[in-house]
């Protein structure tokens, strides 16, 4: 997508090195940084210089490629898989991308691994862009149907950032929105701030503003109120891991939005790229590990000071503890449908397997 009219991806190669947008500084500062070592790739994923399941996977793939150029030995391959895999436990794309790289590289002689790894990492990025473009095309049909029925503006609520900053390009939940904008449909987006890291306020709002999408930032607890009063036509969220039966693990607070949508008859859709499906897991609540992050993310907020610097400010009393689960699981029964690159389906095993029979068979 574009920043000030210039096309960008969230991760790319330039002058022989991998570069990313360091998202910790957005929206107040655009910092582009190189990643040159395995340690830097691990830090970028773990400390959320990059975030979003698809982008985490793409970053891990490039981390493997850079390490193979440094040391293509069997020991290095195994250690790099482990180091990168341990950075974020919830997002399934991380494991998927690392397994893709390991399957490709393990049978090859070390002398061939660096070139093969770089090719595959680039392919993973290009594949992600195409997957998200197709998700947008399918999701556009939902938005168009509402626009034709209402004969007016379509109001969409989204949670966290499932935009192009969470993928290589287009985004998942935002891709239908961008497609609708290009199609001339009048859309308005309610952006959840998404505490505690405020990815909605910091990142999604920045994306919407950069692309000229009409939007309002709302506090996390306002969504239910807006739905009660008929101000939300459609909810579209992303996912960090979706089970074989359609349970959706996404940023903390997604479950509450799904409950409110169900109670108020608002369609609740999940934009789901197929690499985010974990065909080995059936019960999301019982089986998906939920990352618990630092309590400081809850007790402190980061923002722009009057002098323009970005600072962290404590908001809770000294001595107050905080729980900080980063994700929750929305049961499939609350999901209206899954928007995938192959079409829209119900959040249930049979419908998902019908769209992706080869993936379901390989996991059986």
Swiss-Prot record:
Signal peptide interval: none
Enzymatic class: isomerase
Amino-acid biosynthesis recorded as keyword: yes
Recorded catalytic activity of this chain's protein: 5-(methylsulfanyl)-alpha-D-ribose 1-phosphate = 5-(methylsulfanyl)-D-ribulose 1-phosphate
Entry binding sites for substrate: 51-53, 88, 199, 250-251
UniProt-annotated catalytic positions: 240 (proton donor)
GO molecular-function term, one example from the UniProt record: S-methyl-5-thioribose-1-phosphate isomerase activity
Pathway the protein takes part in: Amino-acid biosynthesis; L-methionine biosynthesis via salvage pathway; L-methionine from S-methyl-5-thio-alpha-D-ribose 1-phosphate: step 1/6
Highest taxon, organism lineage: Bacteria
Record keyword Repeat present: no
EC number of the protein: 5.3.1.23
One GO-annotated biological process of the protein: L-methionine salvage from methylthioadenosine
UniProt keyword list: Amino-acid biosynthesis, Isomerase, Methionine biosynthesis
Site (Transition state stabilizer): 160
InterPro entries, per the entry: IF-2B-related, IF-M1Pi, IF_2B-like_C, Initiation_fac_2B_a/b/d, M1Pi_N, NagB/RpiA_transferase-like
Family, similarity comment: Belongs to the eIF-2B alpha/beta/delta subunits family. MtnA subfamily.
Protein role: Catalyzes the interconversion of methylthioribose-1-phosphate (MTR-1-P) into methylthioribulose-1-phosphate (MTRu-1-P).
Descriptive protein name: Methylthioribose-1-phosphate isomerase
Species this protein is from: Cereibacter sphaeroides (strain KD131 / KCTC 12085) (Rhodobacter sphaeroides)
